Design a protein with these regions (language model features):
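Short acidic, glycine/serine/threonine-rich loops at helix termini
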Residues: 12-15, 31-34, 43, 58-63, ...
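Hydrophobic beta-strand segment of the Class I
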Residues: 19
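Short, ordered loop/turn segments at secondary-structure junctions
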Residues: 6-7, 16, 24-26, 52-53, ...
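Secondary-structure transition/capping motifs at alpha-helix termini
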Residues: 9, 13, 22-23, 27, ...
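Conserved two-lobed SF2 helicase motor
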Residues: 1-9
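Extended, highly charged accessory segments
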Residues: 51, 74, 93, 97-175, ...
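Conserved segment of the helicase C-terminal RecA-like domain
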Residues: 27-78
């Protein structure tokens, strides 16, 4: 019997003696649920996990104690996230009227949030209690897997069959016109994206390639929660605005991963208000990296960012796709891919040092020489939109990553073994400027915004 991961939800099929799990299923809980489908009636069972080449799969192969010694229920959730709380309040009001006495159950601020929902005509107030304003069943509008309010339906032209559904963000990143959509091993080309009706039209087409979207990200800090100095850097936990512009897509040949062409994407930017764990490399780290040539530090930053994300996902019991990262100048951002944040970045901030130790261990234990998809390079199993061509083009990303990790952990300086790397001709990054007085910085930013408006006129 072959099944998708849906089998893990508790269906008792009975009579199974073994289970083969292909690739890490995403969390310890999912692994135990899938493994638990076998041996339910007749004693012992046998479970195999066929590991992929992603860092998480390889981590559990080398560290089985992380699997069998982990609690499957230690999930991370941000209960104060207004995106989550507002949806729960609306659903709760359908069951029973809400009052200020519910602060003990639902957390402080229920009254204030209900007032806002009343202004938005989702709740109505009568006699100090809030009721649902409309005759509806609100739970049908609450997504369990995403905070997006919109889902795109995927329609196959010809037979006019509905083949699937994707949330708004995933659709923007993978179902743009010209994209290749893969469904049940068949390839389809996206012919039209109808934003009005949230409909994507695809046509079955045999291709020898798949597509990857190209993006540019801009991260703006809107509120700082915590900051502290660590070895080689300053780390900060902050609310951020992530603006992602889709610049185009590339066509990648199956199996060889050869780039065979590009296409244009004409879609509006994606905006996300979330929480980020920021690693700001100090001036000394940037300056010391210069002796190893151009591209060295940037490549190391990408390697650290990718592995930090994956190993944070293990601790947070989430899919790596729930976390993203961005490298810009001397900054590494690790942020939640969920509006308002859901607690993953906060865990990364709290356990910064411990996760970096895991990252170094993963790099050292990988048997490759220069870097591979099991450690610092992007893998073919999922989109790695933040790992740009620079990390692929630098010949020794593993050595660069290892050097940077020694700096960030305060270990004895690591001497990278670089052969054939071009001699340094210029600094790979501009060293960060000394910090401005906060009031001065605000004034400069204000002037920049005002002059920008003037140019538009």
């Amino acid at each position: 019997m072959v099944s998708t991961s849906a089998l893990e939800v508790g269906i008792d099929v009975g009579g199974l003696d073994g289970c083969i799990i292909v690739g890490w299923p995403g969390s310890v809980c999912s692994f135990m649920q899938q493994a638990g489908r076998a041996g339910r009636r007749h004693g012992e069972s046998l479970v195999f996990m066929i590991a992929g080449n992603d860092p998480i799969d390889q981590w559990f192969v080398r560290h089985p104690e992380s699997l069998f010694g982990s609690s499957p229920e230690n999930a991370v959730i941000e209960t104060d996230n207004p995106y989550i709380v507002a949806r729960h309040l609306i659903c709760a009001a359908y069951e029973l009227p809400l009052t200020s006495a519910d602060d003990d159950l639902l957390g402080p601020g229920v009254t204030a949030m209900c007032t806002v929902l009343q202004e938005e005509k989702r709740l109505r107030e009568e006699g100090g209690a809030w009721y649902l304003a409309r005759e509806e069943y609100p739970a049908t509008q609450v997504k369990l897997r995403t905070a997006s309010e919109e889902n795109f339906t995927i329609l196959e032209l010809g037979p006019d069959n509905i083949v699937g559904e994707l949330d708004y963000v995933a659709a923007m990143l993978s179902l743009y016109e010209g994209a290749i959509y893969i469904h049940r091993t068949e390839t389809f080309i996206v012919e039209e994206m109808d934003h009005v009706n949230c409909l994507v039209k695809i046509r079955r087409t045999k291709t020898g390639y798949y597509t990857q979207v190209l993006t540019q990200k801009r991260v703006t800090v809107t509120d700082e929660w915590d900051t502290r100095e660590v070895c080689g850097a300053r780390i900060r936990l902050a609310e951020v605005e992530i603006r992602t512009r889709l610049t185009g897509y590339k066509k990648v040949r199956f199996h060889s991963t050869e780039n065979i062409g590009y296409g244009e994407v004409h879609l509006p930017p994606l905006e996300l208000d979330t929480v980020s764990h920021e690693i700001s490399l100090d001036r000394e780290t940037v300056m010391q990296s210069e002796e190893h040539g151009p591209g060295f530090l940037r490549s190391g930053m990408h390697g650290v960012a990718r592995l930090f994300r994956d190993l944070l996902a293990i601790r947070a019991m989430c899919d790596p796709g729930d976390i993203d990262h961005h490298v810009d100048d001397n900054l590494i951002h690790i942020f939640d891919l969920y509006p308002g944040g859901i607690g993953y970045s906060e865990l990364g901030h709290e356990q910064h040092g411990e996760i970096l130790k895991d990252v170094l261990e993963a790099v050292v234990e990988c048997p490759c020489v220069a870097g591979c998809p099991s450690c610092v390079l992007p893998g073919a199993s999922r989109i790695e939109s933040s790992l740009e061509s620079e990390v692929m083009e630098y010949p020794y990303p593993k050595e660069a990553t290892r050097w940077l990790l020694h700096r960030l952990l305060g270990l004895e300086p690591y001497k990278p073994e670089l052969h054939g790397v071009p001699a340094p001709v210029e600094s790979p990054l501009n060293p960060p400027a000394p910090a401005l007085d906060e009031r001065v910085e605000r004034k400069i930013r204000k002037v920049a915004r005002l002059t920008s408006r003037g140019n538009r006129g």
